């Protein structure tokens, strides 16, 4: 999206309204993480970010009073974008890993027997969450149904390690 230009040749990202609404699923997920004692840091921050972004009028008023740093970048733009992509990928991996930990804790408390690989395929089939590597999640749980954290699977371990510096 950073490179995409609209029909008039200008960056599309500059035209996207900086507000977001919520349907409640993120909030419910964060509340469940608190109930079950499962850290869900990235999803929690995403919910807070959406909440803050929805307060557009307050942010505009505050920007008239509070001074902040002027956006300025002097580094290697290509390296920055590569790092941004790696950081986004790492956050996605961590979000999935934390989500599976939440489901594991809920299953333990509620006596559920979950098919974690099947859940990944179900998401790929039409849920709000879709990703190419959902198949890799299924493979990880097929290899080790007792996997305690997705990041401990060799594929995901390698991916998170190669993205950490970003």
Task: Name these PLM-found stretches.
Residues 1-166:
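C-terminal substrate-binding/catalytic lobe of Rossmann-fold NAD(P)-dependent dehydrogenases
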């Amino acid at each position: 999206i950073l490179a995409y230009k609209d029909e008039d040749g200008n960056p599309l990202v500059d035209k996207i309204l900086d507000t977001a609404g919520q349907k409640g699923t993120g909030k419910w997920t964060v509340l469940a993480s608190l109930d079950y004692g499962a850290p869900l840091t990235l999803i929690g921050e995403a919910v807070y970010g959406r909440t803050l972004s929805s307060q557009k009028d307050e942010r505009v008023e505050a920007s008239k009073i509070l001074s902040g740093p002027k956006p300025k970048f002097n580094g290697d733009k290509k390296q920055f974008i590569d790092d941004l992509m790696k950081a986004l990928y790492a956050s996605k991996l961590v979000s999935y890993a934390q989500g599976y930990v939440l489901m594991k804790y809920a299953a333990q408390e509620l006596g559920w027997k979950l098919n974690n690989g099947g859940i990944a395929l179900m998401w790929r089939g039409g849920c709000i969450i879709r990703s190419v590597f959902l198949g890799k999640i299924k493979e990880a749980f097929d290899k080790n149904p007792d996997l305690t954290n997705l990041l401990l699977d060799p594929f995901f371990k390698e991916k998170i390690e190669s993205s950490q510096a970003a």
